[in-house]
Amino acid sequence: MATEESGGLAQTAAVKLSEMGERTKQLGNAIQDPERQRRIILVIVCVALLLDNMLYMVIVPIVPDYLAHLESESEQAHVKGNSSINITQNENFDLQIGVLFASKAILQLLVNPLTGTFIDRVGYDIPLLIGLSIMFVSTCIFAFAENYATLFMARSLQGLGSAFADTSGIAMIADKYAEESERSRALGIALAFISFGSLAAPPFGGVLYEFAGKRFPFIALACVCLADGILCLTVLKPFSSRTRENMPVGTPIYKLMIDPYIAVVAGALTTCNIPLAFLEPTIANWMEETMNASQWQIGITWLPAFFPHILGVYLTVKLAAKYPHLQWFYGALGMVIIGASSCIVPACKNFEQLIIPLCGVCFGIALVDTALLPTLAFLVDVRHVSVYGSVYAIADISYCVAYALGPIVAGKIVHDLGFVQLNLGMGLANVLYAPALLLLRNVSLMKPSHSERNMLLEEGATGLYDTIRMEERQRKKHGYSSSGNCVPIDENGTFAGQSKSFSEEETSEPEYI
């Protein structure tokens, strides 16, 4: 009897394992479906961007109060009864907070040119996994840090992780969604996650810090980051057999930087984000001084702006699908809205009035970002090689310039010139830059480059000479010609016996730029 029962249990277990194996196989096949895989990749990238921006902003209500608590005892003993020293200590503390907040963007700004080139060489999946791993470590350090130096290290490490994860994630979306309307929609979804992470993180961090302590918000984010990394490792399989050698060589980042169209887009991305980057560290003190705002009002200042940001993304995606040739106009309109809203901010007398221009700023940023990020990919497609790591590293650099300067420079400007002058200057800069986007008005009419390299790699051979040329390139490293007769070729890829060689410029079709 016991033998029969054990045999039945073994048979049942075998059936269960077989069913589980079959389901796992079906799941694997479903994941390998190209359309499903694109959606999963979009989810992975969006979660990575959400985490990065939540970690960027979640420290706003936590770190200043936590550092003040750590330093209060030593400062109390040192400055008791000495107001001049107390003022100096407060100024130094504000500077420390500003440098801590800016350190992430500064390191990200410095590393991005290198990560862009690295992404172009190895692909998008490995850098994304590297970025998620670094962000996980950074978040754990934040959770257990107990002094300024450790917090500074964690913040800087986050910048390194962001340089990998943000750039590779956006570039991967541009690569997977090659059709313009799909690309615009996918990048719009990514921007919505970025916005939600930035605007929802301060109240998320503030509430959890108040009721669960400093560690819990960071541990929660670290768990989500770990899950996203495991999903990336499972779905993308970044360390499986590589095929990068079959892909085109990306355009060097310095060449992309001097492209006038890409430079105009990069300048617009920097300029439109300056109001947000400069207002975030300064608006709380201004609200306390001018409208006696309560702490809960300061905490949710930017939360209502999430909804117009989503509206701006949605409208731009819909309009771009219907009128793709007006992308430059959507960006210019967004910059004008940002400029007007920035100028209105100092005129607000209460919290309810302030919500309106802040919503205008975020609505305008949504228009600019959603219109111009797909434009960068299109410019690379038609003017360079369709590899997107370096061009989105330039976009990330543009954002980092604004957010590196904001926490350090904004407070100094307010102190020396005033809050009104800061907002008028930011508004004027956006309005004056908007006409520069007229340079992009004919971008939609550009034709893809038909240089020899693009033609051979992307379109295949179109004639006898092109066929021979392509075969020569494929066998060049072996030292043989395409005919298989072991005829040596020289270092330029031409037959050694030829008296005349041709350069790429002489043999390629003209580029339409």
Curated annotation (Swiss-Prot):
TM annotation in the entry: 40-60, 99-119, 126-146, 157-174, 187-207, 216-236, 258-278, 297-317, 328-348, 354-374, 391-411, 419-439
Name any Gene Ontology BP term.
serotonin transport
Q: What is its main location?
A: membrane
Write down the NCBIfam families for this protein, in alphabetical order. 2_A_01_02
- Family from the record: Belongs to the major facilitator superfamily. Vesicular transporter family.
What's the short name of a Pfam family annotated to this entry?
A: MFS_1
What this protein is called in its record is Probable vesicular acetylcholine transporter-A
Organism the protein comes from = Danio rerio
Q: Which InterPro entries match?
A: MFS, MFS_dom, MFS_trans_sf, MFS_Vesicular_Transporter, Multidrug-R
Where is the region Disordered?
Answer: 475-513
Q: What the protein does?
A: Involved in acetylcholine transport into synaptic vesicles.
List where in the cell it is found: Membrane
Query: Could you tell me which residue ranges are on the Cytoplasmic side of the membrane?
Result: 1-39, 120-125, 175-186, 237-257, 318-327, 375-390, 440-513
Q: Which GO terms describe its molecular function?
A: acetylcholine transmembrane transporter activity; xenobiotic transmembrane transporter activity
Q: Which GO terms describe its cellular component?
A: AP-1 adaptor complex; AP-2 adaptor complex; terminal bouton
Keywords, in A-Z order: Glycoprotein, Membrane, Neurotransmitter transport, Transmembrane, Transmembrane helix, Transport
